[in-house]
Each structure stands twice: as structure tokens, then as C-alpha cells.
Amino acid sequence: MADLSAVSAPPSPAPPAAPASPPNAAVGFFAADFSRLLGAETSASRRALRAKAWEHFERQGFPTLRQEEWRFTNVAPVGKTLFRRPAAVDRAQLAAGVDAFRLAGTVELVFVDGRFDAGLSATELPAGLTVTHVSCPSDASRADALLGSVAGIDTRPFAAVATALFEELAFVEVAPGAVVDAPLHLLFYSTAQEVPGASFPRTLIHAGEHSQATIVESYAGDTDAVYLTCPVTEIVAEAAAIVDHYKFQRDSREAFHLSGLALATARGSSVSTHSFSLGGGIVRHDIQARLAGEGSEATLNGLYLVDGRQVCDTHMRVD
């Protein structure tokens, strides 16, 4: 038998290593967008918050069915989708789409693909109520002091992503002692794009002592559009404040809606929140309530109507 040990031949190329997990297109977009936003951030406190949030997301990773908290919510289709920041769309078509979701008798502010749209919004607010957004330098310090103080990101990966990637903050302030009769309607509308769009709406509601207000959030989008909306809302109710909060989720049936709601109540305050989930293809609501003051209370109600392939999952924690 011939001895082949001495025969010199070029080594065979090693077979390619199998990836540990399928490529995650969404995470690639998240990472690139985080780098862009971090580089453009002008607020030192928000820059630190974004960096901390991204660190928490990287530590937790993209959720899978193997994790106890996610065993009923398969978000793999989200991970396989390549998202982009949405581009501008036709104004007439946009206005018609938004009009279908307006609520009569409310003061409406409209956000399109996560960005405030002054042309579609009310120009005057009731006395005792102010709303600013993150690009407005005025009042930014007050917003920064509260932003991220309620919404936990250490065990909630999409809350972490949303904190790292939000573009504009709807900062709602109810003045101490103010009783605002007209409901404020924040309408977040997502548009159809050639490449699925992604937006990360952020809302911060601060109700001063002995104040009272009703806040309505609506999430909707173009019919049959594929997109990701990943909102986080924080409600801070000071002593004896009363906040009635409503959320209507009426996204496209092809959309992904992964949301977080966190609230904190001070002494004698009351927050009631009512969530109605009617749209979306894959929907997840994470709710955190922290009763931080003696005699405070929170009412957490929810209703969802799904059929066919729709998935809606709600997780709640009360401390």
C-alpha cells in the first residue's frame, strides 16, 4: 500500500461554519440606526440613556420562544424583516389616511412614522396642558429628568430598543391643579413604504399635583402595509393627580406592534388605563405599574379582538 503521508497537496478548504442562529435583519438595522442617532444626539443625558438602553438590548438579545417571557409570542418574523426609516409620502394620500382615525371632540396631535406633523395637528391646546417634543430645546431639561425613570429596560428588550432608537418625544405636561376637560388625542400613523418602515414613538406624560386629564393614544397605518411600530409610554402622576389613559391599537393587519406602557403613582394619585387592540399581525403589550405612594391606585383594563393569523400577547407587572 502506498504511503501517502509525504505527498504534498494543497489543503482542502474548510467547510463554512454554520451560523449559530439565522441572520437577524432587524437587529442589523437597529445597530446601524443606533450608531446614527447616537452620533447626532446633542443632549448628554439622552446620549447616556441611549447608550445604556442599547447595552441592555445587546445583553438580552433578540427574544426567542425558548425564553419564558416570550414562549407565547413568536417574533421571529420581525427579526427576518429588513426595515428602514420611512421616507416622506404623498400629502393628500396621507391626510386621507389620517382622517379615517381622527376622534371627534378631542384635541389632536398627529405623528407620522414617529415624527410630529404640525400640518395635520391642532394649533391650540387647552389651558393647563403643554406638549413639546424632543427637538424643542425649551423644557428639554424637565423631560430629560423624567425620561426613562419609569419604563424598565433591563428585562424588556423592545423597550430597550425603543429607548435607544426613538427620534421624537411627545412630552405631555399637565400643570399642577389644572383640570383639562378636552381629551388629548395623540395619533401615531405609519405609512406604506417600498421597504417596510420602522418607528419608535415615545410618549412621556407628567401630571402635576391635583391635576386631571384624559390622554388618548391611537396607533394606525395604511391598509395592508408592513411596518414595525415600537412605542413606549411613561406616565408619572404626582400627588392627588388623576389620569385617564386610553390606547387604541388599529394598525395594519400586516404590521408588527411591540409596545411598552409604564406608570408610577405618587401619594393619593389615580391612573386608569384602557387598552383596545384590534389590528396588527404580531402584537405585544408590556405593562408596568409602580404604586409608589400611599393611597394611590391604578386600574389596568384591556380588550383584544383577533382572528386568523393575528397574535396578541399582554404581559403585566404591578409593584
Predicted regions and their residues:
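N-terminal leader/transition segments
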Residues: 1-201, 208-212, 218-219
